[in-house]
Amino acid sequence: MAPITSFIRWAGGKSWLVPYVAQLTEGLDYNNYYEPFMGGASIFFSLDLPNKGCLSDINDELINAFCAVRDNPERVIRYLKEYETDEESYYVIRATEPKGKYQRAARFLYLNANSFNGLYRVNRNGKYNVPYGHKNATVNYTRLLEAGKKLEGMEIVCHDFSDISTKIVAGDLIFLDPPYTVSKEDTGFVGYNSTWFSLDDQHRLAKLIDQIKKAGAYYIMTNAAHETILEIFKDKGRMVTLERNSLIGGKKAYRGKVPEYIFTNIPERSTK
């Protein structure tokens, strides 16, 4: 299926990286696709995949929403149409905890569309706590239906990133977009699931890359442009530095150009 745009907003999303990945993978003969830090899955949606693969994340609400959109996007839309988008309704819906698969997905997508900056964040008790942000914001139903078709046949699961190691075979393509952690003191808090992504996890990720390379598969990884990251991954493949616009944040002072490292073992001949 032709490339499309993700149906959700996501902090740290990689839509800005789509042109580079398209250039990097042009002419590359790869098999199944894996994205174990799925988020909004912008890279997955941008690719014209030759086969299938697996999308995964540790956020169970995110995974439930993607599964619901894959399995029956029309049903998700029916529940979404029941919601009002004013501020009072937002806080009422935010306080609810629906149990059904499709009701949960609709609430997730509604909050994503109407929350401040499109954040999905919970506190340590697992309660969603992002304030209202958008008046009359709506979910793009056409994009939702397109995503449902694109997701058909994809495995979508909630698990740790390292769990894909037993599935990877030669010729597969893995896109890695971990939370950015650069020191033991500056441990990355993954606010959307109340867990930490530690420096030790960065080392576990380095071991996964070793397994990917040993299997004869390809990988692309984004990470923080920091000397600690360079030290951990310096022998894992070639590295380039790209700049992105920082769009998520409550203070304008924190918005601007931000460098990121891109590591890959895709042969340079595959790029133009």
Where do the language-model regions lie?
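Conserved acidic-Pro-Pro-aromatic motif
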Residues: 170-176, 180-262
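Short, polar loop motifs at secondary-structure junctions
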Residues: 38-42, 143, 224-227
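Short, well-ordered beta-strand micro-motif
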Residues: 110, 262-265
